[in-house]
Amino acid sequence: MAKKLYIETHGCQMNEYDSSRMVDLLGEHQALEVTARAEDADVILLNTCSIRERAQDRVYSQLGRWRELKLANPDMVIAVGGCVASQEGAAIRDRAPYVDVVFGPQTLHRLPEMIDVARITKLPQVDVSFPEIEKFDHLPEPRIDGPSAYVSVMEGCSKYCTFCVVPYTRGEEVSRPFDDVIAEIIHLAENGVREVTLLGQNVNGYRGQTHDGRMADLAELIRVVAAIDGIERIRYTTSHPLEFSDSLIQAHAEVPELVKHLHLPVQSGSDRILAAMKRNHTALEYKSKLRKLRAAVPGICISSDFIVGFPGETEKDFQQTMKLIEDVGFDFSYSFVYSQRPGTPAADLADETPEAVKKERLNALQHRLNQQGFEISRQMVGSTQRILVTDYSKKDPGELQGRTENNRIVNFRCDNPTLIGQFADVYIDSAQPHSLRGSLLQ
């Protein structure tokens, strides 16, 4: 009987990508098959995220629930990876001594070896280093799971925003070689993938070396990906406004495969707070780039990230953020109350704003963002949208669902499952709070 792997993933798309590569690795090297139940597993993996507050508590709480499984089956291997593992390192075993393997985002390629050594020696294995040899050099070809795929094009971040742990947990920016990325996407396309999302913590800072020694930027990468037979839709995330270049704007205007949707985090509309965050741009500079983009690509949707209650944020600062939201007109966006991350510069800043005030501001901001996002959905009613059909509807097996260019789920009645993995034209009948309803056009 094949041995089983259970994997739980917290956090961002990069973690989802990393988890998929862990499955590929362990499937190839140890013939592990994924199971949906931790109690059936021979190996349990927890891929962690440290962006939000209480991330460590969430990790130890989950590990505590698996303690009884380990006691019942001492041969089971429990491994913890991701950004909390990178931050905590061997300290994870101080609170959860039954954990066998601790590895960081840059050492996941060593996972099969670490599991083998832990099994043989019965000794814990910990490696949260940032090796110079890229993990991508040691990964097998990616497993295909549907018509959409994530492709990591770079790792880490060198911006060192004062609130962010990424440079400390994933290291400095390292771009994958250009030809390696293209080879991976060709493999995906040959196996039925129609949409790729190019991933990086600062993806528009991509600078990949080509076979002839040149450095190619993200715009050039997008143009070459668009020329790959079978790839019909391209996304990328997450971007930094500083490196949102004219060449990228030109790519948005000229590459039809690149979706009319951009996620460009701004965090705040206050120049004072942006400076304290070390974002190195102003609200006006952010808006100027979006005006140029919208002039080149009319109708493009913009989503963003916002942090409310950053240390020292005044009511005036918050109102400047609300004004930015009005000026830009965002699609559905992500927003959070600031959470202190140990080891970051912002963790040492005085924070005198009451939590109740922060929550009140967050509610007001989210309410307005949701209004703006729903208005975009409402304006889509009566239009025909080309969607990539991805699966059966979550609520009705008699329906299929897919995504629009601006990343909205569309549910529509259809009794032809062969449409899954294909593009289809759907007439939008109505807008729901978090999805659209449509009718398939023949």
Curated annotation (Swiss-Prot):
Single Gene Ontology MF annotation: N6-isopentenyladenosine methylthiotransferase activity
EC number(s) per entry: 2.8.4.3
Top-tier EC class: transferase
InterPro entries membership: Elp3/MiaA/NifB-like_rSAM, Methylthiotransferase, Methylthiotransferase_CS, Methylthiotransferase_N, Methylthiotransferase_N_sf, MiaB_methiolase, rSAM, rSAM_horseshoe
SMART domains recorded: Elp3
Binding site for [4Fe-4S] cluster 2: C157, C161, C164
Record keywords, A-Z: 4Fe-4S, Cytoplasm, Iron, Iron-sulfur, Metal-binding, S-adenosyl-L-methionine, Transferase, tRNA processing
GO cellular component, one term: cytosol
Domain Radical SAM core intervals: 143-375
Record-linked Pfam families: Radical_SAM, TRAM, UPF0004
Origin superkingdom: Bacteria
Cofactor note as given: Binds 2 [4Fe-4S] clusters. One cluster is coordinated with 3 cysteines and an exchangeable S-adenosyl-L-methionine.
Stored PANTHER family: CDK5 REGULATORY SUBUNIT-ASSOCIATED PROTEIN 1 (PTHR43020), MITOCHONDRIAL TRNA METHYLTHIOTRANSFERASE CDK5RAP1 (PTHR43020:SF2)
Description of how the protein assembles with itself and partners: Monomer.
UniProt record similarity statement: Belongs to the methylthiotransferase family. MiaB subfamily.
Stated role: Catalyzes the methylthiolation of N6-(dimethylallyl)adenosine (i(6)A), leading to the formation of 2-methylthio-N6-(dimethylallyl)adenosine (ms(2)i(6)A) at position 37 in tRNAs that read codons beginning with uridine.
HAMAP family hit by this protein: tRNA_metthiotr_MiaB (MF_01864)
Protein name as catalogued: tRNA-2-methylthio-N(6)-dimethylallyladenosine synthase
Organism (species): Pseudomonas fluorescens (strain ATCC BAA-477 / NRRL B-23932 / Pf-5)
Gene that this sequence comes from: miaB
